[in-house]
């Protein structure tokens, strides 16, 4: 097979994989820039005068800024607690060969998240925690905590044990060695895990739909405000969806090298 043919197959496959999601992304943005009449016209209008009225209405009529702040608070809390709990757990699995704990974490990742929904709802309803940041943060931890722990195991396994032994000979405790020796060496993994946890929490819909309320509604759930009986505000949905996806997409674009480095370096061992 010639080099030219390989390049054609490679780039052709890349275009085939990227074209569908890119088309949906562009269509979503165009929907938010059209009026309601233009969005339901047939055939679709591809040449039109864009308007920002839908984005203005999202903030003025639907209190969207509050929902953005709720998502930011919950995603930040879920990410922070995932790191605080997941890093020691991953270190224990990697250094003490806790295979059973690793299997439990893997099982948590494999279990459908919807299976946790009813027990959590009953517990939070009994404790009067529905529509609170506490309930949503705890449920988001079901997604983010196992992911952080599972990603970090490979990073901790790649740290040479001799470095920790040398630090402990110099008088460091196990905890101090973990904090000042090990964690700086796996900073790429920590950054990658934090970014992935934040994105997963930001995009979470099901738990937020059931457990949130007027005070803690997140942006994925807020899109429901544009759907009512007998009417769907496609322009509003397009504008709201763009506001949800665009910040995370821009953030992921700028940190893409960190994510790639983190996911690949964790697979390498000395």
Annotate each predicted stretch with a short phrase.
Residues 1-270:
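A hydrophobic, multi-pass inner-membrane permease signature
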